[in-house]
Amino acid sequence: MSKTDPGNYFEDFKLGQTLVHATPRTVTAGDVALYTAFYGPRFSLFSSDEFARACGLPAAPVDPLVAFHIVFGKSVPDISLNAVANLGYAEGLFLAPVYPGDTLMAESEVIGLKENSNRKTGVVYVRTTGTNQHGKAVLRYVRWVMVRKRSAEAEIPEQSTPDLAEAVAAKDLIIPATLDFSKYDYALAGAPHAFEDYAIGERIDHVDGMAIEEAEHAMATRLWQNTAKVHFNQFERSKDPSGRRLVYGGVVISTAKALSFNGLQNAGLILAINGGRHVSPYFAGGTVFAWSEVLDKADLGHGVGALRLRMVATRDRPCDDFPGKDETGAYNDHVILDFDYWAAVPKRG
């Protein structure tokens, strides 16, 4: 009996299957420091204990994307070790803040399977839940990923595609129990813009660009114990037409989110992921730019508002003219990410 694990192929998954993922991870200040080094986020709520305490929290929580990447990384050996690409996200909810010292674990349920027409790959839909050391769920999300089949001849007897919500409803958003923005310090946060200053339909060019190098993306992906072959195995990737390793999509998400500080300085706290699509593969060396559109707004009380934001990232193309889809629905060739999320922002009133 082999003691090594080749990972699951598409035909190994079953609808309703539950996968408990190995290697619990205790979050440390070192994780926060490395996250800052890789992406350069500047949101005050995650940077300063004193700022966070003034907002009613016991200390600075980690950026929600840190928790997301850790939980995502736990799931990779069971779900996407043999992936072609991660395709998208939906129904993501951040249920509780995560602090250094918390230990995160993850498990996933297979909620959909769809074999592709080439019979060489299929799409696996999973709902992944991350819990802390107290057994409390801290985040939950759906993702779907294209996975290779071990054998093209393998039959897939039961297939189904889940019916997923277009967006998380504002009434379902969860803010940390003690969060209170009534004494929010806009000067220390870096900008005066509050909930009232953003209008539905408004578009914001985040101006700045950031290149991602080969070593950076590999280290950033290893930080989360993400083992997907497409990010690391250059020997195998040399057989692909691109001949290159794919950059983990989460690297693009976090880079674009860090860039969004310029224009959304007070919208760092992600509450939900409504949807997301990696529009085209990203390879290291290109410069990432980003722009955002305000899709909706909601008053959550306690001086807290929420903005529903569409964040679009591009490769090697500034976003002053907001590149996205054309009149036929086709994306601009430079677009690499289309990401829809809710973020908390302070209210003045």
Predicted regions and their residues:
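HotDog/MaoC-like acyl-thioester-processing domains
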Residues: M1, D5-L15, A96-T178, A284, ...
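A cross-kingdom feature marking solvent-exposed beta-strand/loop segments within repeated
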Residues: A85-A96, V110-G112, L269-S280, L295
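Hot-dog-fold acyl-thioester-processing enzymes
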Residues: M1-L87, K149-I273, G329-D338, A344-G349
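Hydrophobic alpha-helical segments
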Residues: N266, V279, G285, D316-R317
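Short, structured motif recognition centered on aromatic/hydrophobic residues
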Residues: Y35, Y89, L104-S108, V124-T128, ...
